[in-house]
Amino acid sequence: MAASTQCFLHQYHALRSSPARTSSVSSPKPNQLICRAQKQDDASNAAVSRRLALTLLIGTAAIGSKVSPADAAYGEAANVFGKPKENTDFLPYNGDGFKLQVPAKWNPSKEVEYPGQVLRYEDNFDSTSNLIVAVTPTDKKSITDYGSPEEFLSKVDYLLGKQAYFGKTDSEGGFESGAVATRNLLEASSATVGGKEYYYLSVLTRTADGDEGGKHQLITATVNDGKLYICKAQAGDKRWFKGAKKFVENAATSFSIA
């Protein structure tokens, strides 16, 4: 900038030395104005350069970081920084000789319903939705020693609840005369996991006074080291179709010998 100013001053002195153009010599003020304008342009260019550099820096950072979209559902935290999501619907539970996935919003309960019960969790808002684990001694070497899955169910039918009323009655809802409870085996299967045989049973039970339209009860059973392990998870029929199915099925099918 100093060199440019010197150039204008040099031209000014040259004009003064010419006698023919003495009257046309202009005031040195325009030189000062020109210098000021050049200073303003330099400052403006510097500001633009800074803004451009900052824009390029931000753009490069955005391209370099692979940020996932914040695809949060209602009631969930947005995935703003693109971190991998974790399954927060279930929590791992490691018991004495067994393990399973427990619904995260279910609470432990001290209520004991069945022989050998060592664990019980239930829904915070509806205790009908719950799971239990029972461990009892057995002389069987494998779950298959109980017979077929259907035969095994007949030996542990106490898990489904028994009819307490045996008087004469005719209940609505398709019940037989004198019956106030019924059950239907929806599915029975077996599988080998880790060298152990497992039975899986899905049962729908109904009672004449039930306000849930029945209960879906899922049972997983196996034998290990002289012990019969049973996991039963259940939910009322209405809640089953409103989202409880996922929690009951996952809890029952995740059960295994540790």
UniProtKB/Swiss-Prot annotation:
Keyword Protein biosynthesis tagged: no
Keywords: Chloroplast, Membrane, Photosynthesis, Photosystem II, Plastid, Thylakoid, Transit peptide
Domain of life: Eukaryota
InterPro entries: Mog1/PsbP_a/b/a-sand (IPR016123), PsbP_C (IPR002683)
Coiled coil residues, start to end: none
Signal sequence, start to end: none
GO molecular function terms attached to this record: calcium ion binding
Location of the protein in the cell: Plastid, Chloroplast thylakoid membrane
Function summary: May be involved in the regulation of photosystem II.
Family: Belongs to the PsbP family.
Protein name (record): Oxygen-evolving enhancer protein 2, chloroplastic
Organism expressing this protein natively: Solanum lycopersicum (Tomato)
